[in-house]
């Protein structure tokens, strides 16, 4: 049984980062909405609890509250930002609207305490330990609860962190989970290992054996069907399930005509030939392109592609006898997004291709062997299972494929042009050592024509946009500052080698305000 940290989510945009940072310390954790039941918290049996930040103010009538049981379990508690304010207010302290709101970098001076012991960025001129942290708050604690002392402060926030060492309750007004807080990882490590006494028992080799055992116990002798896309998540799920139950797994690979260059061939070779997985190949490219005719709205394209996949998958599943389980490559961020904590207050940005597409009419039991794992853990698992590194570290690819990388209507001609351009882009990034320096890179087809000169002739051809970003969590991203010589080489190759393209542009938009994908 793993030591486990419970993270209660109050709607913070950084909540899943907290979970990732805890996992990085080799400790298992789960993120759940703040309003889970007391019974759930008891049965979870955490060795420590973290209260996330959130957008609410403690002064509103419907302000989220910390379940009282959190303070009664006798385990350490760490409140972050709003979590600290809620803890202070509920334990007898006071919170006020800050006269000076703090958003961004701040320097804090710390007092001796267990949480910050030997953790500092420097010693200031007065001999006090200083921390560089990331703040994001409009309210602040102005009176500590009984039993607490101040353990960090600056001129704007006299109680920037607080501690009740006896009960092992701590609060920090800053965000230790973001990389801008330079010692944040060390602070979280101190909390989970030294204060919560969690063991270093979350590691991939052990997880592989545990996961195989769980799959065998659940599935027994039943057959399992899985929609294999060639992406990282479904590929790792297929490899893990196959390791557990062998030929009881049947994969269905649907070629929708919207895949990357040679993706279908590479996927079939990896799984059918090299790993001896039973894979049914379905070429439905004409069917998908026919259904997409005349559709220009991105959301409608996503829904159409999803609907067609479900219909084809159902048809293939009906041909297989004695299938009792449907396997999916759902990973932990998918679970978090669909849990309904902070999502209740957020608007739809894009429909998620892994959520809501389950064909319920199949009446199959659901098997999601990766639902506990973050993306970096899925990649680590893939390597442990012997999958090729190029596949495991392949950049994310949207479920609708090139359908949402072609702006407007999807046509066969456009898919061919885009496939070639994207392949050149990725090949040159790999050759220059930039592929693994970027988190995601791809080409986008713009259905507009521009005037050019090819030799002595005027040309009027299509435009390709290139997009490459660097990010830790895909919640925010910076455009990758690729060398000009590399961009020039990519542009020259695309224009010279692909008839129909005469202009290449590079997207230098960050996220926010832009999303990573164009549609």
From Swiss-Prot:
Please state the pathway this protein functions in, per its UniProt record. Answer: Purine metabolism; GMP biosynthesis; GMP from XMP (L-Gln route): step 1/1
Q: Which UniProt keywords apply?
A: ATP-binding, Glutamine amidotransferase, GMP biosynthesis, Ligase, Nucleotide-binding, Purine biosynthesis
Q: Which Gene Ontology cellular component terms are annotated?
A: cytosol
Question: Residues in domain GMPS ATP-PPase?
Answer: 202-394
Q: Which CDD domains match?
A: GATase1_GMP_Synthase, GMP_synthase_C
Supply the Pfam families for this chain: GATase, GMP_synt_C, NAD_synthase
InterPro entries, alphabetized: Class_I_gatase-like, GATASE, GMP_synth_C, GMP_synth_GATase, GMP_synthase, GMPS_ATP_PPase_dom, NAD/GMP_synthase, Rossmann-like_a/b/a_fold
- GO molecular function terms here? ATP binding; GMP synthase activity
Q: What is its EC number?
A: 6.3.5.2
Superkingdom of this entry's organism?
A: Bacteria
Catalysed reactions, semicolon-separated? XMP + L-glutamine + ATP + H2O = GMP + L-glutamate + AMP + diphosphate + 2 H(+)
Keyword Electron transport listed? The answer is: no
Which part of the chain is the Glutamine amidotransferase type-1 domain?
A: 4-201
- Please explain the role this protein plays, according to its UniProt record: Catalyzes the synthesis of GMP from XMP.
Q: What is this protein called?
A: GMP synthase [glutamine-hydrolyzing]
Please give the organism: Nitrosomonas eutropha (strain DSM 101675 / C91 / Nm57)
